[in-house]
């Protein structure tokens, strides 16, 4: 779930940044307002609504999480691209006749691979937490599928009966899974988390 949704999120965010860096001031203004509007809405509400309608298939959950979580990454990639487009090697590529598509996808984005890897890891951790939240609340997840959120949901009754260890293990696995993606995402810039 995490890797698939993160791939969709990073792909949409990169394409959004490509469109938003076109030379038209109207497009830049429109896309700035569009992303601010999307960021003002809580994505968890939309994810829960669309997941409850979808029927709980895994691919659909991955797609919904990816489609509802791209805004923060798009804002970060767009800011980095705007800075990168002012650099000397981009000016040289423009002089050599590079198209806007080539400037973004073959010149700028390859130089942002550390940032993209970091965003990929953060988005994967976010997607895992979202899927666990959906499964915990029983929204849009297949009850026959194996999920840490479903395990936590089923173990809450045991918690009230004094069996705290039933909640501990799925919660610890979920925590360690999210932590591992966070560590992987910060290791790309050489300043990883020291444990």
Where are these regions (language model features)?
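Hydrophobic alpha-helical transmembrane segments of multipass integral membrane proteins
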Residues: 1-20, 46, 50, 105, ...
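Generic hydrophobic transmembrane alpha-helix motif, especially the helices
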Residues: 11-74, 79-83
């Amino acid at each position: 779930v995490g890797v698939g949704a993160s791939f969709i999120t990073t792909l949409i965010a990169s394409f959004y940044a490509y469109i938003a860096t076109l030379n038209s001031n109207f497009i830049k203004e429109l896309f700035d307002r569009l992303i601010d509007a999307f960021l003002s809405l809580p994505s968890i509400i939309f994810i829960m609504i669309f997941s409850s309608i979808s029927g709980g298939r895994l691919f659909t959950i991955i797609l919904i999480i990816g489609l509802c979580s791209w805004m923060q990454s798009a804002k970060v990639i767009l800011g980095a691209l705007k800075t990168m487009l002012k650099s000397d090697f981009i000016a040289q590529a423009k002089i050599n006749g590079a198209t806007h598509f080539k400037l973004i996808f073959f010149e700028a984005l390859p130089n942002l691979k550390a940032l993209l890897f970091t965003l990929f890891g953060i988005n994967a951790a976010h997607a895992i937490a979202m899927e666990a939240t959906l499964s915990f609340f029983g929204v849009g997840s297949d009850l026959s599928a194996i999920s840490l959120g479903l395990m936590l949901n089923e173990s809450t009754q045991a918690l009230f009966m004094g069996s705290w260890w039933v909640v501990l293990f799925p919660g610890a696995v979920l925590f360690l899974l999210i932590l591992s993606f966070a560590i992987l995402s910060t290791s790309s810039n050489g300043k990883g988390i020291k444990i």
